[in-house]
Amino acid sequence: MQSWPMPTIPSVPGKPAVLSLFDTSDQLIKPVEVDTPEVGVYVCGITPYDSTHLGHAATYLTFDLINRQLIDAGHRVHFVQNITDVDEPLFERALRDGVDWRELGSSQIDLFRSDMENLSVIPPRHYVGAMESIPEVIAMVETMLANGTAYIVESDSYRDIYASITATTQFGYESHYSRELMEQFFAERGGDPERVGKKDSLDALIWRAHRLGEPSWDAPFGAGRPGWHVECSAIATHHLGSHFAIQGGGSDLIFPHHEFSAAHAEATFGESRMAGHYVHTGMIGLDGTKMSKSLGNLVFVSRLTSEGYHPSDIRLGVFAGHYRDDRDWSTDLLTAAQERRQAWITAADNARDVQQVQQTIQKIRHLLANDLNTPAVLAEVDNWANLIPLNDSARTEAGRLMASGLDALLGVKI
């Protein structure tokens, strides 16, 4: 599937910093694995049945920052992202709206691409739909059936295939959730704990046998379509190998989605751990209330840009909080971001001290390298801007250097 255009990323002089991120599994901040020719990064994409909202944007802007820090340090990044373009939420929305689910998915994918391009997000090298990856999913399911880590439910007319939670001895190492919490989230987040014939209520669907009216693909074990978790597992390992540096997404994906997608890969390839880092972003609320489709309080990126808000202001609004924190979005936050960027523009237009700018850029690098400490980064640039005296001449080398640094490291244009 086609991605979106690559933004221009300026080259910035200075010494890059070693990126360290909080790992959900190990529960600590540690250096990212960069000892391979390419740093593999897999980020879970959208299910394309609605526009890109601020919750989506906050996640993808976080991983854009990670990409930018790795690129700044001279690493080649192999960035892969999926699209869950065949799934129940898409079918349900298409049925509600009286449109073909393929047409709905295609239109929302186009809008997502546009939003990411407007936000200057670095595109994935491989932007992959679930429907494109059926052969890889089938191969993974076949392997799991053959090695006994998956089984066919025989209790009714539908021969669905499930992966056992006992497929790996380390299941649960990513989330560290209790059995009770796993059962709660499994039921709330697309699981089917009541399915008759499963060996364990937490066993995850990896192949849904064909039902009348649903899309399906032929497979040696019967026609059907992939389960949610195995799609990401197959796509990630096909493009990045059985072990790679970072798997990421929102904190609502920790369980069951990321726990199971890692477990499926580990059961297939015999790895003890699919990713070196499991990185998760906090949830975004609106004016003190959790942002959700059911509440109808989503803030869409396309709506903000159509109303005239600059994409860099959206980025600054998101970066005002730390990526791992659950945080709030508001009109006041966006207004403050606009005012902040304008102050930076004014400072860049008046800056004359190149050494001062170089020192500030180095501080930005080190703050970002320490688990993407964006609130401290914004405060550091504010401090620099407040020191700049006003004059009436054109932007000079110092201002151009600061503009390049903010563009390269934050994706913010001034």
From Swiss-Prot:
Q: Which InterPro entries match?
A: Cys-tRNA/MSH_ligase, Mycothiol_ligase_MshC, Rossmann-like_a/b/a_fold, tRNA-synt_1_cat_dom
Q: Motif 'ERGGDP' region: list the residue ranges.
A: 188-193
Q: Might you give the EC number(s) for this enzyme?
A: 6.3.1.13
In chain numbering, motif 'KMSKS' region lies across 290-294
Q: Which UniProt keywords apply?
A: ATP-binding, Ligase, Metal-binding, Nucleotide-binding, Zinc
Per its Swiss-Prot or TrEMBL entry, what cofactor is needed?
Answer: Zn(2+)
Give the intrachain disulfide bonds: none
Q: Which GO terms describe its molecular function?
A: ATP binding; cysteine-glucosaminylinositol ligase activity; cysteine-tRNA ligase activity; zinc ion binding
Residues reported to bind Zn(2+): C44, C232, H257
**Gene Ontology biological process terms, A to Z:** cysteinyl-tRNA aminoacylation; mycothiol biosynthetic process
Describe its function.
Answer: Catalyzes the ATP-dependent condensation of GlcN-Ins and L-cysteine to form L-Cys-GlcN-Ins.
Q: What is this protein identified as? A: L-cysteine:1D-myo-inositol 2-amino-2-deoxy-alpha-D-glucopyranoside ligase
Question: What is the species listed in this Swiss-Prot or TrEMBL entry?
Answer: Corynebacterium diphtheriae (strain ATCC 700971 / NCTC 13129 / Biotype gravis)
